[in-house]
Amino acid sequence: MSDKIHPVPKQVKAQALIDKEKYLKWYEESVENPDKFWGKHGKRIDWFKPYTKVKNTSFTGKVSIKWFEDGQTNVSYNCIDRHLKTNGDQVAIIWEGDNPYIDKKITYNELYEHVCRMANVLKKHGVKKGDRVTIYMPMIPEAAYAMLACARIGAVHSVVFGGFSPEALAGRIVDCESTFVITCDEGLRGGKPVPLKDNTDTAIHIAARQHVHVSKVLVVRRTGGKTGWAPGRDLWYHQEVATVKAECPPVKMKAEDPLFILYTSGSTGKPKGVLHTTGGYLVYASMTHEYVFDYHHGDIYWCTADVGWVTGHSYIVYGPLANCATTLMFEGVPNFPDQGRFWEVIDKHKVNIFYTAPTAIRSLMGAGDDFVTRSSRSSLRLLGTVGEPINPEAWEWYYNVVGDKRCPVIDTWWQTETGGHMITPLPGAIDLKPGSATVPFFGVKPQLVDNEGKVLEGAADGNLCITDSWPGQMRTVYGDHERFIQTYFSTYKGKYFTGDGCRRDEDGYYWITGRVDDVLNVSGHRLGTAEVESALVSHNLVSEAAVVGYPHAIKGQGIYCYVTLMAGHEGTDTLRQELVKHVRAEIGPIASPDKIQFAPGLPKTRSGKIMRRILRKIAEDDFGALGDTSTLADPAVVDDLIANRQNKATA
């Protein structure tokens, strides 16, 4: 924990939308009188039918979350149509291609046409309100058009990250029974093609075996690469949009009508379909975007995430566009053609607000300062981080080297489930401590509890819960409300349990310490240990597997796998490589194991439960105090694991 404090810079304070006094006043009202506070701020979006009810939520019993429930609106209308009269010619999306010489600017007028045409294509092929549409796309403007087109006609989109495998894509198609997929011939990442259409074809075959049949696939031509083609099912996007009008009226949606499903890893094997609805989500995404990034009209804003993750939903597409912002969409990677790419893009497009992940910061820090200092970065006003806690060393480098000691670093803590920022500094109001997410956003009531559920006051270390609802909160797990209740509200009754550990210091600042459940945070992406374990066990030579996280210099957390093989088989380096490939094929490259330790047995209690605490300690090369091992069925297993650990500190 860093003791250093960076006060709000004078020039930031002078032009900030929210100062300390306003933050304290608004925050108090937001938690003391949420109906009044959100009743006022709900009007930041346009409503076809104004709401009269604001908050109707319960964290007990059946758990029900409703905001602005009698209002009617449309997300696509709020992100596009309402800006056309005064800002139609303003750039909505700057697209920066994988190739540094290719970019494109799309105005709000052009965005309107693209989205209406895509919406009309969906309607032409039978997609209607409530239908689920799967989007498996690279970071190209058509991915945003697809999301907004679904929102326009009331279809529910399920965006699947383009780095996920066909198996992972199939699982998500099956779970939400999607019959329409939007994809691309190939993606481009770091100069290499990604076979998205071929992956889609494989996924559709897998889904069909589970009785979910995709009837149409809309394919955007990105590279012109060869792909399979199913006549009657597959449609070229460029051909289809040429046949429809560039106008499509937005459907009136109830505030609680579903907007999207986004799958996220849980502590059990099957990913959860996080369901977000229309009104509350957009109010919260747009409000957090404006105040957390101190967004002023005319700012060029760049979030480096992918639309396949919630950060891309809330802070590339919906939040910025609802605020009539100019949002930059980046197809590439931070180290292609070299490690200076981010800083070159900032100079090229005069970016004012830059939002990225600690993993990227640590990786670029390792490449040295020269890549940064050869660029000017003079347009930058604000830096942000997202996805995982940032270590103070990386924070200081980001602040000192990238931001030239003049740009506040906004360290945001939130989740797929929360829809938007929860604990975060506001640039003009909150002094910064490197490594701390600082204080709660308006309407957010954090609480620390110990493992028994006792509430901890003052400076404390515990499990982070939120005690009341906020408009951006997920409403349910798609198709499984019981799982929603069990996952988030059963551990500590009447509270939303985040799954994160947290420390609160004597100034009331919050420091996120990482997951306390069986979920890894690898490069800012959540991954369930159970998912990786089931991928390993699906290999014909693996009898049993246990997966834990360990500290990783770049990724934050690395993936450490303990693998027991079938009788008669020996662990070799070749098999290690084969297992890494196998996991990549089952889930995707983000799940690649960093360390695989072959183990004759795993530490189990007499009842057969694996003692993960011991496995974590060994993976961390910290086995001096393993705690009580008396309940182990075979304590000798531990000695073997220690002797053969893969993470020995080098002398």
Curated annotation (Swiss-Prot):
Protein residues bound to CoA: 189-192, 311, 335, 523, 584
GO biological process: acetyl-CoA biosynthetic process from acetate
InterPro entries: Ac_CoA_lig, ACAS_N, AMP-bd_C, AMP-bd_C_sf, AMP-binding_CS, AMP-dep_synth/lig_dom, ANL_N_sf
Reaction(s) catalysed by this chain's protein: acetate + ATP + CoA = acetyl-CoA + AMP + diphosphate
Domain of life according to the entry: Bacteria
Entries under SUPFAM superfamilies matching the protein: Acetyl-CoA synthetase-like (SSF56801)
CDD domains hit by this protein: ACS
The keyword Ligase is assigned to this record: yes
List of residues binding ATP: 387-389, 411-416, 500, 515, 526
Function as written in the Swiss-Prot or TrEMBL entry: Catalyzes the conversion of acetate into acetyl-CoA (AcCoA), an essential intermediate at the junction of anabolic and catabolic pathways. AcsA undergoes a two-step reaction. In the first half reaction, AcsA combines acetate with ATP to form acetyl-adenylate (AcAMP) intermediate. In the second half reaction, it can then transfer the acetyl group from AcAMP to the sulfhydryl group of CoA, forming the product AcCoA.
Record family assignment: Belongs to the ATP-dependent AMP-binding enzyme family.
Stated name of the protein: Acetyl-coenzyme A synthetase
Source organism (scientific name): Rhizobium etli (strain CIAT 652)
Gene for this chain: acsA
